[in-house]
């Protein structure tokens, strides 16, 4: 399966997950959703490794740490933004990650001097984001500006995390290992917020939503990680 196809499927699953997160935010805090999402991901990947073989031991723990840190922060902020914004607005702000990636890569190319970035790809990314904005038609009220700023920051952090995913894939780290440590980071961060702020009681609907968020996110992360490892970064970003 091509990287572009993997990215499209991943984006579809992430969008579906966003809907589930919006509904789940009526029952749980963003920290709780991050925690349970991480639990589902870590357990699923651990079971896959146990059944199919492989190893969770990594030669680059520092890279996984920084990828997990930026990714979990981005995820937590996005879930928080989803809870306080119209879903279309929250999704649009998250899709800003592709624009941030283009800016980061362009800035890096300028600083490095010799590196070249295809201007057509950057134009494609910007056009893609404009198309998303036109379709979703995001709106925001004055009392939602804080959540909007949080959503914007989450998109920037997501771009950083995606670039780190690309770097991990380029050095040969398998996607299951990348997703496992990211999920583990979510468990730790979510647990800390729950210790500080407490936890809400479960309902059947709430548990079903948490399970859906975890499964959709895990599969989407695996597909996205493979896409960034094998495809062109900006091409993937334009499809996100």
What role is predicted for each listed range?
Residues 26-43, 82-100, 144-157, 203-217:
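Structural signature of hydrophobic alpha-helical transmembrane segments
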Residues 45, 139-198:
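Transmembrane alpha-helical segments that form core, pore/gating elements
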Residues 80-83, 97-121:
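C-terminal transmembrane-helix exit sites in multi-pass transporters
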């Amino acid at each position: 399966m091509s990287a572009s196809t993997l990215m499209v499927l991943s984006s579809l699953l992430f969008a579906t997950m966003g809907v589930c997160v919006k509904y789940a935010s009526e029952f749980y805090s963003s920290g709780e959703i991050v925690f349970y999402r991480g639990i589902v991901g870590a357990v699923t990947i651990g079971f896959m490794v146990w059944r199919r073989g492989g190893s969770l031991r990594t030669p680059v723990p520092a890279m996984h740490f920084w990828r997990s840190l930026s990714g979990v922060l981005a995820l937590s902020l996005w879930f928080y933004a989803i809870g306080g914004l119209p879903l279309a607005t929250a999704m649009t702000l998250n899709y800003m990650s592709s624009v941030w990636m283009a800016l980061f890569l362009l800035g890096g190319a300028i600083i490095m001097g010799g590196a070249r970035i295809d201007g057509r790809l950057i134009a494609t990314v910007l056009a893609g984001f404009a198309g998303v904005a036109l379709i979703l038609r995001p709106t925001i009220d004055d009392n939602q500006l804080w959540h909007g700023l949080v959503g914007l920051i989450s998109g920037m952090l997501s771009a950083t995390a995606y670039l780190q995913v690309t770097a991990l894939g380029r050095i040969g780290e398998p996607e299951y290992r990348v997703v496992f440590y990211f999920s583990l980071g979510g468990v730790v961060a979510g647990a800390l917020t729950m210790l500080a702020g407490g936890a809400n009681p479960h309902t059947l609907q709430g548990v079903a939503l948490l399970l859906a968020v975890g499964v959709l996110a895990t599969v989407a992360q695996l597909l996205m990680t493979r896409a960034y490892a094998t495809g062109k970064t900006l091409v993937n970003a334009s499809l996100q």
